[in-house]
């Protein structure tokens, strides 16, 4: 197990959500979303967007499916973010 997987596993247990989430699916979903937001919008927007995704998914009766759907939606939104509004590097 690598450091990231160990950390995610520990955090899921600490937050008492280990039975409610698939760490592998969640990791891929959140990292893809974070990459798209950081690259296309602004680096600080990535963790904030991931947090907001978690809040929205947590309010759902099916958090995994909701997180998948919303992550895809937000990735597309970030990819369409206008060039002139992107943070300068």
Where are the regions that the model predicts?
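Hydrophobic packing residues in well-ordered alpha-helices of helical domains and bundles
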Residues: 4, 30, 67-70
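An acidic intrinsically disordered interaction segment
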Residues: 1-28
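Amphipathic, hydrophobic secondary-structure cores in small proteins
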Residues: 21, 27-60
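Short, glycine- and charge-enriched coil/turn segments that flank and shape catalytic ligand pockets
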Residues: 16-21, 60-67
């Amino acid at each position: 197990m690598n450091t990231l997987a160990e950390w995610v596993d520990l955090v899921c247990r600490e937050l008492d959500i280990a039975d409610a989430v698939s760490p592998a699916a969640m990791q891929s979903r959140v990292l893809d979303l974070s990459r798209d937001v950081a690259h296309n919008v602004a680096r600080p927007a990535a963790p904030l967007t991931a947090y907001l995704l978690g809040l929205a998914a947590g309010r759902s009766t099916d958090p995994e499916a909701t997180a998948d759907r919303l992550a895809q939606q937000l990735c597309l939104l970030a990819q369409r973010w206008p060039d002139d509004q992107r943070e300068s590097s």
